[in-house]
Amino acid sequence: MSQLKNGSSQCLWTSICIVLIVMSMAREAVSTNYAEALKNSLLYFEAQRSGKLPPNQRVTWRGDSALRDGSDAHIDLTGGYYDAGDNMKFGFPLAFTTTMLAWSNIEMASQLRAHHEKGNALRALKWATDYLIKAHPQPNVLYGQVGEGNSDHKCWMRPEDMTTPRTSYRIDAQHPGSDLAGETAAAMAAASIAFAPSDKAYANILIGHAKDLFAFAKAHRGLYQNSIPNAGGFYASSGYEDELLWAAAWLHRATNDQIYLDYLTEAETGGPRTVFAWDDKFVGAQVLVAKLALEGKVESSEQIVEYKSMAEQFICNCAQKGDNNVKKTPGGLLYFLPWNNLQYTTAATFVLSAYSKYLEAAKASIDCPDGALQASDLLQVARSQVDYILGSNPQKMSYMVGVGTNYPKKPHHRAASIVSIRQDKTPVTCSGGYDKWYNNPAPNPNVLAGAVVGGPDDNDVYGDERSNFQQAEPATVTTAPLVGVLALVF
């Protein structure tokens, strides 16, 4: 009998050891994925670079491109980022990308440093802000686009070979764009905070631009696509009130000046929102004001309470504890809209991650209609979304290119889908690119590491086809929010 007991004991301990080893290996695999994903997310921005590439460029299949941008307006507009899978520089989504990169650098600074990616994260941010500084040559002048969207999209060319028009478009006092100027002000203000610890002089330059742009946006009201009609078919703005709030919130955080807080408390809060994205920043502004309230840095008022309430309502809905919960796919992905859904998922995931830090610091929680949320609950939801994106989904596919082995091989991306100019300098023509590369059934010759595609549909189904642009096209606005989240959940 005792031998049986001893045998059972040994069996039990062996089973426990095996389970612990398997769990440890699983944790290590997840950690490895986070590390790989964080590194790749920043490499992606190097693949999106426009202009003269620096000596420390790590994505070596790319080359210099668009070196005459701005020449039609007698201004240097080289640099910046191509917005997605085309060769366009759209200022509106670029500015949002910049703000989110800055927010990651601010909120997750210690985590980025611990994972040895802080330098790369700041370089990704500076590539954007250097361009935005060039694009703002006068207080009331801001260049908001380089390139012709329609002609660019009719061609399938490497950025290094571009022959499409590179027209420069601007807003000014006579041709306003409060949304574009406001978002760019937010980007500059947020970036000034990110750079202040390491480069105070550069931070001061950025805050000067931010103040001028906010004043410009307020004084000359209007939608930017009315001044730059070419942008309307690609990144039309639905309004500018959110960008003005967003800019004021970042300027207040950067300067602590009362005038920006006054603007926030005198304006409408935006009410309940269903998304946070390049065209709707109300949630971002609400979260920044809620942070002030949690820290006790502002006097409580009906308006401040509403900002916090609206921010937390969005979070409750993302965490499935609200009155109007965000739809989830059967596999567990937060699903907002069919076209490039992951841009909304990554932005919402950033909000959850940042707010978890604010709650933890304040030792606070959120009272949702369907129960309380602690800081750890928010982080758990954020991690579940990251895990889904990196492969814990019904397709067993990572929707970030280059992570693991099963990831999209044919993202809708001109530069990645055409042989590198480093390998073959033969120019690729406008129609030739479509004939030889766009319609090629083979995987893209260049791995666009770190690119997050649009993602699966509401049934967790994804079609890995270059022509499937709604699902297969990556964009800077999708990856930017994920940088900080990856650093935090790692």
From Swiss-Prot:
The keyword Secreted applies. GO terms for biological process: cell wall organization; cellulose catabolic process. The keyword Thylakoid does not apply. Pfam families: Glyco_hydro_9. InterPro entries: 6-hairpin_glycosidase_sf, 6hp_glycosidase-like_sf, Glyco_hydro_9, Glyco_hydro_9_His_AS. This is Endoglucanase 13. GO terms for molecular function: cellulase activity. Residues 1-26 form the signal peptide. It is an enzyme of class 3 (hydrolase). The active site is at D86, H412, D464, E473. It is found in: Secreted. It catalyses: Endohydrolysis of (1->4)-beta-D-glucosidic linkages in cellulose, lichenin and cereal beta-D-glucans. Glycans are attached at N6. Belongs to the glycosyl hydrolase 9 (cellulase E) family. GO terms for cellular component: extracellular region. Keywords: Carbohydrate metabolism, Cell wall biogenesis/degradation, Cellulose degradation, Glycoprotein, Glycosidase, Hydrolase, Polysaccharide degradation, Secreted, Signal. Its EC number is 3.2.1.4.
